[in-house]
Amino acid sequence: MDIVLEICDYYLFDKVYADVFPKDGAVHEFLKPAIQSFSQIDFPSLPNLDSFDTNSTLISSNNFNISNVNPATIPSYLFSKIASYQDKSEIYGLAPKFFPATDFINTSFLARSNIFRETLSLFIITTIFGWLLYFIVAYLSYVFVFDKKIFNHPRYLKNQMSLEIKRATTAIPVMVLLTIPFFLLELNGYSFLYLDINECTGGYKAILWQIPKFILFTDCGIYFLHRWLHWPSVYKVLHKPHHKWIVCTPFASHAFHPVDGFFQSLPYHLYPLLFPLHKVLYLFLFTFVNFWTVMIHDGSYWSNDPVVNGTACHTVHHLYFNYNYGQFTTLWDRLGNSYRRPDDSLFVKDAKAEEEKKIWKEQTRKMEEIRGEVEGKVDDREYVEQ
């Protein structure tokens, strides 16, 4: 995110923050006492790990005894442990990296590296980008890919598309707010994101390998999180809003409860905290993930690939609830005994109206049996065909 943030700071935010939050301006004068009080707090220093006598003060690796633990040293030890993972050369805002300094870079009391400014900037950028990506990709999918015969499906809801859009547009800012801490960690050097491509970083070969590793890691993480979201107590509170859509349009892709969306995004944010990932590839993969999320909700069934968890597989998940939890592949569903092969009827092209009604009727019958087991007898959805 440092690339995106510096672009925005260079072309827009430096001047905006200088105008709205200038040094010695009214806002700065009002906040000065609070800033000074905060700066005078005596925070514990972060000691050098090498200075710890772990045998006597914390934990003896050879002869662990709870009596050897000195509680007073634990916070400092944890702080130092965390600090040891920080790459100070990757802290954002201390000096420009990609563009020259602007005339406004030092004229706001909120410097580029200020955590409050970073939080506000990230919220604005990611929310707007999230909305734009959602509407552009979903609209293009709706116009050029989406099978509009789904509007006649007996389990299509009244005003469904407007409900999907309302749910998504209100959820995206909250999901962004919940994920900002991960972006802040990245901006402050607590990740394995890198930019230089050389022998030390593995060159272009390493970047090519990062794509399947990212897909496999996140696919695994989402599978288990998705299964957890289907636990009855969790499903009822968090995941049921997304399963309101039995048959989907592309606009259902981001129509989540925001906490549900946050949990399902965790693997994407955890990956660069655990494994090396090129910064440009990181931005590409995050964009790709949003494309993919729209694509698997577009109701157009072109592939019945046994490996790829495509639109047909995800349609089965929305219709029959307890199957196909994976995001990109069918691997974990097969290992977890939750894979359900899409019905052949999904791939019938140019079916006659009567034949299509029979297919939908059979889908509805199977769906209602499973829905009753998952949600109970009462169905609060309002369908077009009641």
Swiss-Prot record:
Q: Where is the short sequence motif Histidine box-2 located? A: 239-243
Cell compartment(s), UniProt: Endoplasmic reticulum membrane
| Domain named Fatty acid hydroxylase: residues | 214-337
Q: Which superkingdom, per the lineage?
A: Eukaryota
Q: Which UniProt keywords apply?
A: Endoplasmic reticulum, Iron, Lipid biosynthesis, Lipid metabolism, Membrane, Oxidoreductase, Steroid biosynthesis, Steroid metabolism, Sterol biosynthesis, Sterol metabolism, Transmembrane, Transmembrane helix
Q: Does the keyword Iron apply?
A: yes
Record has Transcription regulation as a keyword: no
Annotated membrane topology is: Multi-pass membrane protein
**Biological-process GO terms, alphabetical:** ergosterol biosynthetic process; filamentous growth; filamentous growth of a population of unicellular organisms; filamentous growth of a population of unicellular organisms in response to biotic stimulus; sterol biosynthetic process
| Reactions this protein catalyses | a Delta(7)-sterol + 2 Fe(II)-[cytochrome b5] + O2 + 2 H(+) = a Delta(5),Delta(7)-sterol + 2 Fe(III)-[cytochrome b5] + 2 H2O
What are the names of the required cofactors? Answer: Fe cation
Q: Per its UniProt record, what InterPro entries does this chain match?
A: Fatty_acid_hydroxylase (IPR006694), Sterol_Desaturase_Related (IPR050307)
Entry protein name: Delta(7)-sterol 5(6)-desaturase ERG3
